[in-house]
Each structure stands twice: as structure tokens, then as C-alpha cells.
Amino acid sequence: MNSPEKSAACDIYDPKSIPDYDREFIDPDDLRQFENALNDNESNSLVALNDWRPIYQRVRKNRGRRKKPRRTTDETREGVLYTVLKWPFLFIVFGWITVLGFAYALTRFYIVLYERWVSWRGKKESLRRELWKQTDYNNWLKAAQALDNHLGNQQWKEIDEYAYYDHLTINKLVNQLRKARTDVELQMRNGVSSSTVIPATEELCALLEGCVKNNFAGVENPRLYSETYSGTKNLVQEYIDEVEKCIQVVSNNKWVSNEDKYHHFKHLDTNFGRTALCLSGGATFAYYHFGVARALLDNGVLPEIITGTSGGALVAALIATRTDEELKQLLVPALAHRIRASSEGMASWIWRWWRTGARFDTITWARECSWFCRGSTTFKEAYERTGRILNVSCVPSDPHSPTILANYLTSPNCVIWSAVLASAAVPGILNPVVLMTKKRDGTLAPYSFGHKWKDGSLRTDIPIRALNLHFNVNFPIVSQVNPHINLFFFSSRGSVGRPVTHRRGRGWRGGFLGSAIEQYIKLDLNKWLRVLRHLELLPRPLGQDWSEIWLQKFSGTITIWPKTIPSDFYYILSDPTPERLARMLNVGQQSAFPMIQFIKNRLKIENAILKGLHQYSPAVSPAQSRRKRGHAGKPSDPMVERLDHNLPDRQPDNKEDLSDSSGIDSNVSSRDSCLQPSSNRRNRRRSTGNIFQEMRRQSAVFFDDSDLYAEDDKKVE
């Protein structure tokens, strides 16, 4: 290693090499306001029952009175058989689950031995070891291609036929797209009149509108990328490249008006959808996400939409509040010097847990977390700074209220670090916290009427439905590090970039018998957990239904599973050292390398559409970049406008002002004026001004996942 390489290696461990290392972004007043909001609900007002009875009068308890049940009356099931059989049935099922868990561990051990001594032997084993030694994607790609050549996977790429996509349609469409694109380019090059060019361009646009759709003809089926270590079918790659060229031809066509181009790209964007990076929870296992993000960033495939839950929310906040240049300097082992949430000793933890029921101090975590969020930055401010859309999943402390996905649309003025804390507030580890909102004067105030929130992983670790609702996301890239889920990850037919080597990719991991037993045991475990939940037999430690940490969906179209080691469980609530973080960065990058080509092909079309959409959008200047543009003007949400209109300081003084406002505001104002006298309306506005201000903060909150769709499902049935 020469001197420049040694210097670079030393820099990545030097804390002074990362930007803003010594800077404290948060204002002490913000922490003080947060502490007041936390303690506000804990104080009891001193109220006497009457003038003759003292405050807090001691009353002897009636020993014969029945104890109040932990659950409310509506939750507690009744019936003789339920009361008698509940606990025996619960113990029997838990005993059977324990037996299944032991059998599952033996099955996985058998599969590991089978793959080690049967599947991986000889030269392919040495090639695989060489593959996993690579820390750079280009070198990894060369090693992957060498392994594909040895296994004969290159011949598989050259054969168009495959059961998991419609190769006949794709082959025919590639020829049509190429012919239409060539005709348009030839006519534009020869200077043909617009009457001749426009019909050819319309034909090309019609072809694009018919094929630019999510997973059209199965070209985005993960199975197409699960038969080789690098790449996919040559026909699929040719189709993706041709679609990108056709989109660029339409975008550069001077005979088509900008308005028509905008509507065309808007249509393509709606049909094709968006890509999002979803970072799971998992305590300190979440630091593997840093490596995943670094691999995507270095290869130019980091999505603009990012969501995080629990520990993943901290990583997502760092990514969404920094530019690409800042991230390249931050995602290094030296970042471990800024991760100081668990620096206290064991004695402090035990004393705090005994006093408060939580292992960590909320204010300390808020101070440390604020550095990753650039102080009291809001979701809207982060979007305006970097162009990335941050989403954080939070669960209300009330077990029956729906979850929330906080982002710049649903809660634009919510402070990011408060949402990250709420998403990481696991019962027993961190007490539920209050979300904070930034007011116009820069001070902080409680959000959502002071309700408290806790760990989002308990119910919505990967909020796919909410992402689809808000941002049309239909291609989630999930980085999954939850330790209780990683233990059960097993792809019997291979995964993206990791094919089954047994019988040249057409076999089963561990043989058919091993894969069949593994699938049966895993499905049986899932079945009994669902039985316990639906029969309401599970107890609720710490007032929380814990069944969802097993039964929710934890995967996406692409799921990245960083490989953990046993020592990670020992350090699950400890700050990483630079050496441990360096290993986690390396493992995270290596786990993402097999997915890079699949993500590149997806974003190749998506970015071409977005580029044309932003270039010809009437609301955005063509010179503005998506990452560097801000939002000028007022929000266009009709609900926000209606609530703003009802505030006393926003009322129009004359008809001209009323006509300048949106049509929705005019209709609401005119309707209200017909229903109420003017004096009553003024009195009502004065008395409810504070309520409308709070409602305005909460106006765009949309709730997430199963609770959102439960009512619709009932209506359909």
C-alpha cells in the first residue's frame, strides 16, 4: 500500500474528515420546548372534589371489589369456555411453536451442510470466494461474470424463451420501437416538414404509452435476475435500452409542443410508477443500511423517495438531509464517532429503567439524533434542500389508532428528529414521545394535539401501501435487517443476483426435500401465530400487541438482506466502534451489489421519464434540477387552503380578494355565508382560531396501511 492509499485509509477513520463533525445544529430552546411537551401530560392538575374535602383524600380500598382488568370491557372476551381454555390452549400452541422452531433450525443446518459439501465444490467455490472479497462494484461485476461463465449462465442469457415473461411480445415490441424511432430520427435529420414527422412521432408515443408500465410483460419479474450473478436476458436488456432511447427521441423532438410532451410524460409517469428505498428497523442492525445506501449512491441508483422505520429512520434522515457530495464524505467508518446514543454506563440504565420504565433518556437521544437531521429541520425543508422525499413511519401509543407516515405532504412542518425518535420508541427501551412542529416564528410546539407516538416497526415496518397512496410507489427496494426476520429468510429458488447453483440454476437449495421441509415449517409457524392473534389469546406486555412484528409484510420487489454475525446480537443496543462500522459498511455494500443491475434498469426508464416531465412541466423552469429546486409559493392542498381561509388573518376583505383565491375557497366561503349570519361567523372564528391553527398543522395527515383499508375491504365484502 503506497502513501496516498494509506492517507485515504486513515482519513476514513478520522472524525474530523466528516462534514460538520463538531457542529451542534440544534438550538437548546428547541430541546427545552420538547422537554416541556413531554412533561405536559404527566402533570396532574390540583382540583378538590368540593370545598369541604381535601385534595388527594386517602380512601381505603374495598378489598372485596373486583380488580379492574388490564384491557377495557370491549376488548376482553367473555364466555366460560374462553376463560377456561384460553391459557391451556395458549401454552399448547407455544409449545408446538417451540418444537417447530427447533425443527426449523435443524432444517436450515442441514441445508447449509448440503450446499457446502454438495453444491459448492471445486473451482466454483474458489470463484465464489473471490466474488465476496470484492469491495468495489466494478471488480465485483468482473468476478460475477467470471462465475457466470464457469456455470454456463451466459448461454441462458442468449436464449429468449423463459417461462416468467412474455418473450414473444417483447421481441415484437423491440422491433416496432426500433423501427418507429429510426423513422423519426431519419425524418428529423433530413429536415422533413412537420406534417410528415408528427404522424411518425405519434406512432412512437402510442407504442411507449402501451408498453411503459410497471412490470410490462413480466420484464421486471425478479426471477429474470435470479438465474445469473450479473445481468438478465439479452432480450430484456435490449428492450430496456430501446425504451430509454425512444423516450429521449420524443423529448428532443422539436415538432412536438412542450404542452403535449408534458402530458405524454405525465401519462408515462403515472403508468410506470416510482421507486423507493425502504429501510427497516432492527436497533443497531440498522447500521448495515449505511453500506446499502453507499453502494446505491456510488453507482448512481439511490432513489429520491426514502422511508425509514425505527433504526432505519435515523439512516433515512441522514440520507434525506444531505446532498450526494456530503453523503460521500459521511458514509465512512469515522461516522461512528457521532453515534453516541448508548454511551452511558449500566448503572445509569438500570436506575433509569427502574424510575421511568425506559432504558434510554429521551432528551439525550433527541440531542444526538438532531445532528443526523441537521437540527430542527422539517420534512418540507429537507425536501427543498436535497430533493429527496423522506418518510418516517410512526405508531400512536394508543393500540387502536391508525399509524401515520410522516413526509413533506402529510406533515410538512413536523420536525424530523422528533419523528425519528417516535419511530424508534420501543416499549421498555424508549418511552413514547411527542411529535414537534415548527411554527412560523421558528419555535417548536406539540404536534397532533400532543399525542404520543412509538416504534413504527411494531405495525408498519415497510409502509408500502402508504407510499403507493402518496407517491405512486410500486417498486419498493427494501433493506431488511430485523434480526427476528433475517433468521427466517430463505429463498429456495434463489434471489436477485444469487442463483441456485444446484443443477445449473434449475434445482432447489438443499435439494427439493430440504426446501420443502423449510417451507412447510415456516408456513406452519405463520399459521399458528395468526390463530393466536385472531382468537385474541396473546397477552399484551407493556400494553402492546406484539403479533405484528412477525405477521406484517417485510419484503419488497427487491429485498436486500445484509449478512449478520452472532456478535451483532451482543451489541444490539451499543454504539458501534469505527472498526465495527467499517465491517457493517462493507457487508451492506456487498449485499447490495447483486441488485445494482436490476435497479439500474428500472431507474433507466424512470429517470428518463422524470427528466422529460420536469423539463416540460409548466410549473418548473427547465433549468432547475430536481435535487436543487425549492417550492415557491403556497401549498396547493385544497384542505390546507380551506383551513387557511377560515383563519381570521386570512379572511378576504372584498370580492376581488375572494375571486383571486382558489375555486374551492370561494365555494366554501359562499356556502358558509349562506348558512350563517355574518356576526355569528365572526364570533365563531374568534373562538376557534386556535383550533383551526392546530387543524392546519394536521390537515394533510393521511394514515397508513391495514387500518386505512379495513373499511374499504368491509364494503367490498
Swiss-Prot record:
Compositional bias segments (type: Low complexity): 660-673
Disordered: annotated segments: 620-696
Compartments where located: Membrane
Biological processes, Gene Ontology terms: cellular detoxification; lipid catabolic process; triglyceride mobilization
PANTHER family in the record: NEUROPATHY TARGET ESTERASE/SWISS CHEESE D.MELANOGASTER, TRIACYLGLYCEROL LIPASE PTL2
Membrane-spanning segments: 87-107
Gene Ontology cellular-component terms listed: lipid droplet; membrane
Family: Belongs to the PLPL family.
UniProt cross-references to PROSITE patterns, sorted A to Z: PNPLA
Active site: 310 (nucleophile), 455 (proton acceptor)
Membrane topology: Single-pass membrane protein
Keyword flag Cytoplasm: no
Source organism superkingdom: Eukaryota
Motif GXSXG: positions: 308-312
Primary location group: membrane
This enzyme's EC code(s): 3.1.1.-
Enzyme type, top EC level: hydrolase
Bias-annotated ranges (Basic and acidic residues): 639-658
Function: Probable lipid hydrolase.
Keywords: Hydrolase, Lipid degradation, Lipid metabolism, Membrane, Transmembrane, Transmembrane helix
Name of the protein described by the UniProt record: Patatin-like phospholipase domain-containing protein AO090003000839
Chain ranges of the PNPLA domain: 277-468
